[in-house]
Every structure is written in C-alpha cells, then in structure tokens.
Amino acid sequence: MEKYERIRVVGRGAFGIVHLCLRKADQKLVIIKQIPVEQMTKEERQAAQNECQVLKLLNHPNVIEYYENFLEDKALMIAMEYAPGGTLAEFIQKRCNSLLEEETILHFFVQILLALHHVHTHLILHRDLKTQNILLDKHRMVVKIGDFGISKILSSKSKAYTVVGTPCYISPELCEGKPYNQKSDIWALGCVLYELASLKRAFEAANLPALVLKIMSGTFAPISDRYSPELRQLVLSLLSLEPAQRPPLSHIMAQPLCIRALLNLHTDVGSVRMRRAEKSVAPSNTGSRTTSVRCRGIPRGPVRPAIPPPLSSVYAWGGGLGTPLRLPMLNTEVVQVAAGRTQKAGVTRSGRLILWEAPPLGAGGGSLLPGAVEQPQPQFISRFLEGQSGVTIKHVACGDFFTACLTDRGIIMTFGSGSNGCLGHGSLTDISQPTIVEALLGYEMVQVACGASHVLALSTERELFAWGRGDSGRLGLGTRESHSCPQQVPMPPGQEAQRVVCGIDSSMILTVPGQALACGSNRFNKLGLDHLSLGEEPVPHQQVEEALSFTLLGSAPLDQEPLLSIDLGTAHSAAVTASGDCYTFGSNQHGQLGTNTRRGSRAPCKVQGLEGIKMAMVACGDAFTVAIGAESEVYSWGKGARGRLGRRDEDAGLPRPVQLDETHPYTVTSVSCCHGNTLLAVRSVTDEPVPP
C-alpha cells in the first residue's frame, strides 16, 4: 500500500472492505477492495481470484477499469477505477416519484448495453447485474458496470449451474435450476431497464417463495403510459419468460429506439454544453396533401394549427349529460371504448385499461354555490387500472356492473359483480381486480362481448364460448340454463363465427361471409328471426318469440345482404350492410328505428334521412340509436330524455347530427351504447405538409 494513501472506508462488500484511496503517483482517486484471504473458504478465494481474472480481460469505457492486485497483511488488494457519482440505485432512489425522461433512460440503458456486449464478447457472464452494481461518473452522465465477483468465464467444458446473484434480478430459468447463460444476463438487463422507467423493481415480494412465484409467472406492473410503445415493448421482450424469446444484445442495439440513443452517445459524450438561441421559423406556405384517413372537422388549408391536437378524445353523453362531454385523458391515445350500466372504459394504444369514474363525494365539481339554480355539469376523473402484471389489453367489454378484457396473448380477464355467474369463475363471487378466466386458458381468444348479464367469447380457431344468465336461450346452448363457467356453443354446420355481439337478453354472431345468426329473446322481431320477405308482416303463429340456439336471420333484407356492423339494444337492433345502408328492426316505441313513424311493424326498415351517406358503424342503447358514417359523421335518433341523443332535442324519429367539440380533423375509432349512455372515441388526423 506504499503507493496509495487510504482516505476512508466507502463500503463493505460480500467478501471484504472497500476503501477510497489516493494514488500518490498522479493524485488520482481509486477504489481498493481489501479481501482477507485467510478467513475465506476455497469458493470465496476463487471468487476473488475470478474478479481479478475478469477485470484483466475487460477494457471498455462503460466497465470499471482494473489497475492491479497485490497481497498485503494476509489480504488480497484489488485496485480499480473510482466512480464518484454513486450507484444507479442511489440515483433512482433520489428521484422519489419523479419519472425520468425517456431520453435519459435510453442514455443510461445503451451504455449498460454496450458494456454487457463487451463482457459477453469475451465469453464472460456478469451474473449479478443490478442497479447497485452500476456506477456513475461525477457528472452522472457516464455509466460503468462493476462488481464481477461472481462472474463466470465460459469455456467449452463449463456451464454456470450455480444459482447466484441478487434474488430480485434472478431469471425464471435459474428458479427452475437450469444453467445460467447470456439470456439470464439479458433478463437482469430488462430488470434494470424496468427500474429506470418505473423507479421501482420489477419483482419484489415479502419473502423468497413469493418472489420466485412472481418471477416464474412473469407478473410485473406495466411502466407508465408516458413512455413510447417501443420502450414498453422492449421491456416486455427483455422480460420474456422463455429465454429464447429474449432478443440478443446485437438485436437490441439494432432497434431504432436504441440506434438513436447510441448515435447521440457517441456524438455527445464529452461535448461542452452551450446555450443556443432558437431562431423563429417563418410559417410555411407549402400546401398540404390529403390524408388517406377519412375525417371530420375544420376545413383543411395550408396553415397548420399552432397547438398540436390531442392524440385522441373520448366523449360521453346520456345519463344526464345533454351534449357530448370530452372526458379527461391521461396524455394517451384511446383506440377502443366500452360502456356498461355504470362503467366507462377504454383501451389505450399501448395496451392499458383506462376507466372514467365520478369523483368521490366532497371531491368538488358536483356542488352548487348558494343561490345557484343551474345543475352543475357532471364531472369525471380518469385513471388507469392498476395492479396489472405486465399484461397488454387489446379489447374491453362492459356488462351490468362487470367488465371483461382481452389481452394480446388471447387471455380473457373479468372483474366486477359476479351475479348470474357472468365473471366465468365458477361462482357468484364479486371480484375487484381483473382475474383470468381459467377455463379458457387452453384457448387463444380473439374477441369478447358482454350483455347485461352474460358473455360471449370467440377463439382464434372460431370456437365459441358463452356463460352467465341463460333465460330466453341467450347463451345459444339449446337451454335456458345459466352457467358460471364458460360453455362451448355448438355452431350450425358450415358457419364460421367472425364477430360476437351481446344484447340485454340475446346474442348475435356475424359469420365470415357476412351472414348473421342470433339466439335469445326475439320480442318485436328485434333479432330478425321471423321469416319475412320485403314489406311482409308475419301472421301471429309465424312469429318467433325466442331461439335457444343460434339461428340464421330470416327477415329480408338482413338474410340477403352481407352485414358489416350490427348491435343489439333493449328492444331493437341495427345493422349496416356492405353497401353502407343502415337497417333497424324491433320496437319503434320511441322512434329508435329512424322511420319518423311509431308504427308497430316487425319487418326491418331502412333508416330514413341518411340517403347518400355511407354508414360504417352502428350502436344501440335502450331506446335510441347512434350511427357513424364512413366520413366519421355522427348521427343519433330515438328517445331524447336525459341526453340520450347528445343534443338538447326531445325525441327525434329521424337521424340528426351530433356535434363534437373538435377543432382539428378527426376520425371516429370506436362507439359504444349501453342503457341510456354513449361513449365515443375519436382520433385526431393531421395533414402532413407536402415535401418540397
């Protein structure tokens, strides 16, 4: 130690004391690990020797540099580079709950990536990669990985069978007793990336068995929706349960997300930061090209708006909301919405479930000032459904007080009221958090639909399942029995289901060629099951009141034209044909058929007032209808009480437009009606300037 001057003890490692020292030759601060050899076991001495051996092989700006080792006072002394910025774990802890910018995350991540690539190139496994072993320079800009005490140099005859490392970062294959390999380091890399994005560990538990269970099932909360889909997907790929599905380091570095950060790293590290005055940019006079997306909104012109449009908007009306109310958003794009009796739910492009709820009593927004006479506008708060373990939601459906969602892996989860067995868990128990419908785990599901108290689900192999309340034959099982577990539904020969729809007490299927089959209550011929020619009315004994199994529609023209969209209301239904025509059938008590007459006909009728307008989507509430045009026009008709039509009108027997508070062109992406409520999602469509 004559070449060094001890300054202070900075830590106590697994095998010894860590000193901060001054190297006398150049007055440089260094770290010296003092490892007492005499008290060490053979394995511990091997680990200490191994660290020296590994550090000698490595030479990289993002790996702690090795200087020398020597014996003194019956202890092995290892001199290495000092990183004054502390550990990455300390850096994360000091952030509290203030999330890092994505650019900062990637700046750190690609340096760790380069370091690990250098290590693997020398056929070395780190085996203990964690934020506590990742160090920072004094500016906290340069990352250096260290602590190679339990690294393993691979030879053709050795396999790293020992289970080592910090438990929170151990991969699933290690939990199973399989050999440690490079993909295990990549799992740990994913844990570090997750920690950078979430400021917390991906896997934590009160005890080791619970931790192993979490790791083995790959259950971790999704990272914030503020980050790009590419970053979120990178986390998921690194934390794949199957080692073979984790990308190799070269593939990670080749991803556009990382290439940009790597380029910035090589051009910016060591540069001197300078302030730069931003010059004002004169508005461009170039014209704009027409986008291929059909949209509604302000007229297009060469001047682009100063304020960028939101990614998407979700509107709600009905239930006392007389006009469309834009719901609060969490800086995300909602691609699909679903309305229930009380629920308002949506799915974001990044695969998170967003819910809109009334604020708690006393939270403001719902009280009147003394002397006020007007009713306050109802307020809603938005929140992401928490507690989901790294799952990506791609579709949501709502019933009466319960919700079903479908993940990108084809798994259905349900939560809410368990009455009538509509959660599919084999009981009537209420469940507050989304829970997997275990009976369907052997199938990859592609769609789920909810009625008031029953559910239909469709698999990739076009297998159909139903559960919940069964009266009127709504489950299509040939009986009126209820079921609390999914039951496979028999399909008529030659029919292949493509889409499922549920109503209050009935169900419908769209088949691959565009035909429709229905079961359940056919009151008022709301399912179109009466066998009718155009303009014909059935005699009473020919009227079909209910069907216990899925049956082809028999009322013209529904049995003749391919159908694109269909929805079921309480006492009526609506369908859009391949040619863009909208037909309604069932009860017209409140004008919900759009014929400007309250006639009591059981025959389907073409909606009046939409001539020349091609329709694309339709949704039915309890006594009203909402239709969306191919150009994203929004129309409603039927009962107007409590804001059902999205305007101040009373009942309207003919379609009238619904005005949305949009200042930018938009396209409607999803619509859902339930009882007296409507949810509608729109996506902003911006025109890109024509390149010069």
From Swiss-Prot:
The active site is at residue 128. Its main location: cytoplasm. Changing residue 497 to P: In NPHP9; a full-length mouse NEK8 construct containing the mutation shows a defect in ciliary localization with no apparent effect on ciliation, mitosis or centriole number. GO terms for molecular function: ATP binding; metal ion binding; protein serine kinase activity; protein serine/threonine kinase activity. RCC1 repeats lie at residues 312-350, 410-461, 462-513, 580-631, 632-684. This is Serine/threonine-protein kinase Nek8. The modification Phosphothreonine is found at residue 162. Changing residue 87 to A: In RHPD2; likely pathogenic; contrary to the wild type, it fails to rescue body curvature defects in zebrafish morphants; decreased localization to cilia; decreased interaction with ANKS6. It comes from Homo sapiens. GO terms for cellular component: centrosome; ciliary base; ciliary inversin compartment; cilium; cytoplasm. Belongs to the protein kinase superfamily. NEK Ser/Thr protein kinase family. NIMA subfamily. Changing residue 602 to W: In RHPD2; likely pathogenic; contrary to the wild type, it fails to rescue body curvature defects in zebrafish morphants; loss of ciliary localization; no effect on interaction with ANKS6. The gene is NEK8. Highest expression in thyroid, adrenal gland and skin. Low levels in spleen, colon and uterus. Overexpressed in breast tumors, with highest expression in infiltrating ductal carcinomas and moderate levels in mucinous adenocarcinoma. ATP binds at residues 10-18, 33. It is found in: Cytoplasm; Cytoplasm, Cytoskeleton; Cell projection, Cilium; Cytoplasm, Cytoskeleton, Microtubule organizing center, Centrosome. Residues 4-258 form the Protein kinase domain. Residues 282-293 have a biased composition (Polar residues). Disulfide bonds: none annotated. SMART domains: S_TKc (SM00220). Interacts with PKD2; may regulate PKD2 targeting to the cilium. Interacts with ANKS6. Component of a complex containing at least ANKS6, INVS, NEK8 and NPHP3. ANKS6 may organize complex assembly by linking INVS and NPHP3 to NEK8 and INVS may target the complex to the proximal ciliary axoneme. Interacts with ANKS3. Its cofactor is Mg(2+). Changing residue 150 to M: In PKD8; uncertain significance; it rescues ciliary defects when transfected in NEK8-deficient epithelial renal cells.
